[in-house]
């Protein structure tokens, strides 16, 4: 039942590897240290079944940890063995999966042994405030001499009726920093000794960003 759990990892970048047919495959590298079960939620006490997972355990003296975290979080960490984690994520699972783990249990890439496809969730790269041509792929205005709206969006409303622009239209705004899930990525290799996973293709985020890896739904293997 641990196969229902997700893993918190870190994007390390991209590299190329050769597959068994000799083809060059672009892969994303994800490093996964030990994940800790920080909290268990059941339908009887919380209304749903879930497991809270912690990662990136702080290696520092106790006095330093007390300064970095609030008293509420310190009390929360003591229930799971006293290990303070920088990252906490909650995964909704079945009742059997909750019963298969205990507070303070550690697990890693071994739960994905034999898994061929995974879903990866992360925060996309932030690109700042962008116009409609970059963000939405608008064509823009005429490029001829005398034109004054080369990169404008064009008309987005009418005159006196309704006398306003309807909400939800595509306009210049902040681009990136969105929660993105890339589904059904092929697992190229899982190296338990080096604690890294190679998946085919690109994943959201910058180098060093936190990603959540889970088994793809509806995919055998």
From Swiss-Prot:
GO biological process, alphabetically ordered: translation
InterPro entries: Ribosomal_uL3, Ribosomal_uL3_bac/org-type, Transl_B-barrel_sf
SUPFAM superfamilies per record: Translation proteins
Keywords: Ribonucleoprotein, Ribosomal protein, RNA-binding, rRNA-binding
A family per Pfam: Ribosomal_L3
Record's signal peptide: none
Function: One of the primary rRNA binding proteins, it binds directly near the 3'-end of the 23S rRNA, where it nucleates assembly of the 50S subunit.
Subunit organization: Part of the 50S ribosomal subunit. Forms a cluster with proteins L14 and L19.
The name this protein goes by in its record: Large ribosomal subunit protein uL3
Organism, as annotated: Chlamydia trachomatis serovar L2 (strain ATCC VR-902B / DSM 19102 / 434/Bu)
Name of the gene this protein is made from: rplC
